[in-house]
UniProtKB/Swiss-Prot annotation:
Presence of keyword Glycoprotein: no
Coiled coil: 364-429
Classification lineage: Viruses, Riboviria, Orthornavirae, Negarnaviricota, Haploviricotina
Major place of residence: host cell
Protein's UniProt name: Phosphoprotein
PTM summary: Phosphorylated by PKC/PRKCZ, and other unknown kinases. Phosphorylation is necessary for viral transcription and replication. The N-terminus contains the majority of phosphorylated sites. Ser-249 is the major site of phosphorylation, but is not necessary for most functions.
UniProt organism field: Sendai virus (strain 6/94) (SeV)
Region annotation L protein binding: where it falls in the sequence: 412-445
Keywords: Chaperone, Coiled coil, Host cytoplasm, Phosphoprotein, Viral RNA replication
Superkingdom per UniProt: Viruses
Length: 568
């Protein structure tokens, strides 16, 4: 059971029985070894042996203890002093003669202890109960200085499991000697302890040889209230809050070595300022092993463990969070994600809510939770948008398919209309060709029933050209498009005649001509022919006497015959 529950009584009797004014420190260690050597199960079952006083009249070589039931004897090696500093280092060789000097006082129940001469720096293992291995390792896990769980949690756990009290005894939990003072309260949460987790060295009190009584829950609570332990700050390590009740792992049973553990600085002379009258108070840090994260920040007395510096850092973190929120809102506004910073602060969207909570997080656990929520909400919104896009694409595809069907039906309808139109046109063409008559198809003169508006082909009256009469191939062609070989033969007789006339002038064309142009042309044709001069004069005279076209035609036929006879 817990060492704090052992309350020694009859102080005055003890002071009278004390042989000297001051006991050695090794006697206290031997006394604690006798208490710790008892089995945890027997302590929880029968505590009647605690009423009897302790006598150590036998020599230090005997290594027995007798229980009230008369069970077997168990030998226990002595523990070495755990204190750091020059005053607290006591070797095993020194404890032997001091135990012999004090051996005449404790002999009533044949409780014996044995001191073995081990003076090394390694921890000494101890066998509890029936001599089995207690599981004590070489390197204690408590050397790194982690604070243990709360006092009330230990009390409840020890009440439920009395077997663990022996383990705590073997582990070296803090006990208070009768007549001693409680641990000093240096400040709020024990933050100003300045590495006083080391055991303060002091001389032993003369009153520590009293009779042990049966501890009751009320006495245990009184001792626990008096021994208010606080977690200490060892060196430059940060404070670790107490462990959550129910999740605390039971530490291994062990004794620390004589020297200071390797993570703690050696205790200075200021820590051993207790006077000779003040009894030694043995304190041992109860800190969880590495890797155990503690959650609770307040002990049983309700005081906060962390100092005011932590609160200042928290306020500073809140200010940084506010500035980071403003920067994030400004960034989102600049990127065009939101319209204004007010929208970021007042938005009800899950992503914005988790983003604000992540920026306002006070610790990494809350920040991790909010960041996970932000990622999941963003993924959910992205998945929702992807689903919406899929639905939209599906609707577009359906619309395209319907448009294709409509276009196909329209094409078929257009083909039908074209074929009907062509059939109507062919029918109309047949009707117009027959002239609207279906019975008499052999008739030569047909009058069409449908008259199309078309340009009538009128026969153009060809003007008579006298030069055409001599050239059969170039008939009815004007002079301007004739070949050059014929131009040499025709010397433009009209101009030649005018030039030869003495009265020819530009004004002569303005006079009214008594001769028609056709008759004039025919006379020029006769005069330009290769006939003799007499024949030319006879033909010109006969033309002037002609009154009808038939007469002119007959005269010109005669002229042509004469010209042909001459050319042939």
């Amino acid at each position: 059971m817990d060492q704090d529950a052992f309350i020694l009584k009859e102080d005055s009797e003890v002071e009278r029985k004390a042989p000297g004014g001051r006991e050695s420190l090794s006697d206290v260690i031997g006394f604690l070894d006798a208490v710790l050597s008892s089995e945890p199960t027997d302590i929880g079952g029968d505590r009647s042996w605690l009423h009897n006083t302790i006598n150590t009249s036998q020599g230090p070589g005997s290594a027995h203890r007798a229980k009230s039931e008369g069970e077997g004897e168990v030998s226990t090696p002595s523990t070495q002093d755990n204190r750091s500093g020059e005053e607290s280092r006591v070797s095993g060789r020194t404890s032997k003669p001091e135990a012999e000097a004090h051996a005449g006082n404790l002999d009533k129940q044949n409780i014996h202890w044995a001191f073995r001469g081990r003076t090394g720096t390694n921890s000494v293992s101890q066998d509890l109960g029936d001599g089995g291995d207690s599981g004590i390792l070489e390197n204690p896990p408590n050397e790194r200085g982690y604070p243990r769980s709360g006092i009330e949690d230990e009390n409840r756990e020890m009440a439920a499991h009395p077997d663990k009290r022996g383990e705590d005894q073997a582990e070296g939990l803090p006990e208070e000697v009768r007549g001693g003072t409680s641990l000093p309260d240096e400040g709020e949460g024990g933050a100003s302890n300045n590495g006083r987790s080391m055991e303060p060295g002091s001389s032993h009190s003369a009153r520590v040889t009293g009779v042990l009584v049966i501890p009751s829950p009320e006495l245990e609570e009184a001792v626990l209230r008096r021994n208010k332990r606080r977690p200490t700050n060892s060196g430059s390590k940060p404070l670790t809050p107490a462990t959550v009740p129910g999740t605390r792992s039971p530490p291994l049973n062990r004794y620390n070595s004589t020297g200071p553990p390797p993570g703690k600085p050696p205790s200075t002379q200021d820590e051993h300022i207790n006077s000779g009258d003040t009894p030694a108070v043995r304190v041992k840090d109860r800190k969880p092993p590495i890797g155990t994260r503690s959650v609770s920040d307040c002990p049983a007395n309700g005081r906060p463990i962390h100092p005011g510096i932590e609160t200042d850092s928290t306020k500073k973190g809140i200010g940084e969070n506010t500035s980071s929120m403003k920067e994030m809102a400004t960034l989102l506004t600049g990127l065009g994600v939101i319209q204004s910073a007010q929208e970021f602060e007042s938005s009800r969207d899950a992503s914005y809510v988790f983003a604000r909570r992540a920026l306002k997080s006070a610790n990494y656990a809350e920040m991790t939770f909010n960041v996970c929520g932000l990622i999941l909400s963003a993924e959910k919104s992205s998945a929702r948008k992807v689903d919406e896009n899929k639905q939209l694409l599906k609707q577009i595809q359906e619309n395209v398919e319907s448009f294709r069907d409509i276009y196909k039906r329209f094409s078929e309808y257009q083909k039908e209309q074209n074929s009907l139109l062509m059939s109507n046109l062919s029918t109309l063409h047949i009707i117009t060709d027959r002239g609207g008559k279906t019975d008499n198809t052999d008739s030569l003169t047909r009058s069409p029933s449908v008259f199309a508006k078309s340009k009538e082909n009128k026969t153009k009256a060809t003007r008579f050209d006298p030069s055409m009469e001599t050239l059969e191939d170039m008939k009815y062609k004007p002079d301007l498009i004739r070949e050059d070989e014929f131009r040499d033969e025709i010397r433009n007789p009209v101009y030649q005649e005018r030039d030869t006339e003495p009265r020819a002038s530009n004004a002569s064309r303005l006079f009214p001509s008594k001769e028609k142009p056709t008759m004039h042309s025919l006379r020029l044709v006769i005069e330009s022919s290769p006939l003799s001069r007499a024949e030319k004069a006879a033909y010109v005279k006969s033309l002037s006497k002609c009154k009808t076209d038939q007469e002119v035609k007959a005269v010109m036929e005669l002229v042509e015959e004469d010209i042909e006879s001459l050319t042939n």
